[in-house]
Each structure stands twice: as C-alpha cells, then as structure tokens.
Amino acid sequence: MLNVTIRRKAGQFGNLVRTSAMTRRTGSSHLPQLASTRELGVTFIGHSSFFIQIGGRSLAIDPNFARWLIVLKRQRKPGVRLRDLPPLDLVLVSHAHFDHLHRPSLRAIARLTRRYCGQAPTIVVPKNVGDIVARLGFSRIVEMNWWQEFSDDKLTITHTPSQHWGARLLRDFHRGFGGYVVRSAKHSIYHAGDTAYFDGFREIGKRLDPEVALLPIGAYHPAHYRNVHTSPEDALQGFLDLGSRFMVPMHYGTFRLSYEPFDEPLKRLREAAAKAGVSDRVLALEEGKTKIFK
C-alpha cells in the first residue's frame, strides 16, 4: 500500500513538472516607479518577492528572479528585472525554503548594489539562517527571533510569528521562519512569509497595526497543505484579523507548487472579498507595477 501511495504521489509531481515545463512563460518586466520619502511604494515582482520603498529606504523581500525553481519552470516573468532595481538598503528573507531564499538572486543584489553605491545592503534573516547567506557579499547579516526588533536609519523592523517550518533540506529544522513588519514614521507594511491561518494574525495586528498586509493565497491543495499554507479564504480572514487597511495577495501565479488550478487562487480571493464587502481593500497587483500609498 505504501509503495502504491509513493508511486501515485510521484506521478502527480511528475505531471506538475511536465505541465510547468510545457507552459509558455508569460508576463513582462517594467521599471519600478519611484516613491517619495513620505510615500510607501509596493512593487510586486512575483511569487512572494517585492520591492518596497518606505521612509526613504529601498528594500527587497524574499527576492527570487529564478527562471527555474530546481525542476519547476517559472510561469511568469519577474515584474522587474534584477538589473533595473535601484540600489537597496535592506533585504529581508522570511525563511530558508528555496522559493523564498534564492541564493543566486541574493548574490546578484549584493553585487549590483555594491557596484552602484560602494556598499552592499544589510540582509535580515530569521534565527539560524545567517550561515546560508554568509558568503553572498552582504555588508551585514542580522538574525532575528520572533518579536525581536531591528532599527535601521528611520525604519523599525519586527520579525513576526507564522505557522510554517524553516528547514531548507531534511534535517535542519533548527532554522527560524516568520514574517516581518516594517515601520516608518508614517507607513507600515507586513509581509507574512509562508504561513497557515493562525491566531497570530490577530496578535500581529494588535501589537503592530500594519497598514498594508502582503499575504499568501496559493499552494493549498491537497487539503493537508493548509497545515502550512493559507487558502484564499484563510488569507482574507487573516487580513480581517490583522485590521490592516489594504491586502496585497502573493504566493500565487509564478511557480506551480501544488495542485489547485493555476488561476484559482485569485478568483477565490476576489469572490471571498466581495462576499465580505472588502473588494476595494484587496489589491491584486500586476507584476512590475508599483502601488503608491500616500
């Protein structure tokens, strides 16, 4: 029986790989719109990757520009080409999984920023993840535990809990994981990383009250995937628990990581938002286009 189950799952994954490989990559890249020092700029690069402008600082969160995620072909082009990013002050990585911590992208960011302005950015990672990024060229590595704060110039960064796991391979379960809330004097933004729905959304909202929430909506089928990922409806409930003004969905439409129809997450999110009466607060961003919050 076990062998039958293994063969069935291997066959399903093989179909996922073949479908990814045979699907034509779509989308286009754009130059990011630049925000003023008093504005919050949010640019969706794809998957869980964002270029963020806040408090006059430039950040990348979970940057991944890979054409292939090991055997899975990227289905949509990055919304911003790596070489078109301005010099970055900070890079935040939510956890060590390959779709969130992409070493070649991180190495290129450190190199390009150092070339443009003479100094590589600081990289912020969860506890026990620093060794993975230690030789990528960053000027400083900051490791954080949940609820720990790090101040950089005019920003405060808080590492927040999530319901996921942090191992990059099979035995390194000591690695941390979570999300981040980044706050300036005027704006705040929350990136959840990967997470299932959990009571922590309410606690994050109570403690930090983020203005904008970047929440994952894909990789929820089969049902047991929801032990570590949010469905669209779960993500919307997390948004309501947080009490944020706006939600921006992520973790969908870039890599085929699970077995729901590829276009289903966004459709279900829009239906759930309409039912809850918050459609005007759920902003699905096109890759490469910048949303400016005044």
Regions found by a protein language model. Give the residues of each.
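Zn-dependent metallo-beta-lactamase
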Residues: 1-60, 65-69, 287
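Metallo-beta-lactamase
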Residues: 16-37, 125-187, 267-294
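Pre-active-site segment of Zn-dependent metallo-hydrolases
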Residues: 26-34, 54-96, 100-114, 167-171, ...
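Short gly/ser/thr-rich secondary-structure transition/capping motifs
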Residues: 41-44, 70-78, 193-195, 229
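Active-site-proximal beta-strand elements of phosphoester/diester hydrolases
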Residues: 41-44, 58-62, 156-162, 188-194
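Divalent metal-coordination and catalytic microenvironments
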Residues: 52, 62, 95, 102, ...
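Active-site metal-binding loops of divalent metal-dependent hydrolases
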Residues: 63-66, 95-96, 128-129, 160-164, ...
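Cap/insert and terminal regions of metallo-dependent hydrolase folds
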Residues: 90, 121-124, 128-131, 198-286
